[in-house]
């Protein structure tokens, strides 16, 4: 079986997401929607990069591979969001941070739920594709 090539848009999309994240770090904006969107974009792009590392995924069946990638995206979204929340709070020298420790820990506590949701969504997509 031949190795699938990376799409041409993957590297520019990754670069654009990084630029948007750095611009977001400089702004005075602290909504959870934006940090989850950036975290989700980063996790999805990371999963796409990992999916094209063919030797890593070739030994898994298609359904298991989709579930693992879904779990990676779900859990990675929360991990990336918490990391971005920490970076934004650490880089801004405010008396009161953009995100509190309670918000960051609350977000991290949702990691198993988001990973499970990603696994279920990945499995569902795999079932629809197999028809």
Task: Name what the model sees in each region.
Residues 1-131:
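Juxtamembrane/disordered regions of integral membrane proteins
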């Amino acid at each position: 079986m031949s190795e699938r090539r990376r799409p041409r848009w993957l590297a520019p999309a990754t670069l654009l997401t990084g630029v948007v994240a750095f611009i977001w770090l400089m702004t005075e904006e602290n909504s959870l929607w934006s940090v989850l969107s950036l975290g989700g974009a980063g996790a999805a792009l990371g999963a796409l990069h990992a999916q094209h590392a063919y030797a890593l995924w070739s030994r898994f069946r298609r359904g298991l591979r989709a579930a693992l990638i879904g779990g990676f995206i779900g859990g990675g979204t929360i991990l990336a969001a918490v990391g971005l929340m920490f970076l934004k709070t650490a880089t801004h020298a405010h008396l009161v941070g953009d995100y509190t420790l309670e918000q960051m820990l609350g977000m991290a506590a949702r990691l198993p739920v988001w990973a499970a949701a990603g696994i279920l969504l990945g499995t569902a997509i795999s079932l629809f594709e197999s028809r």
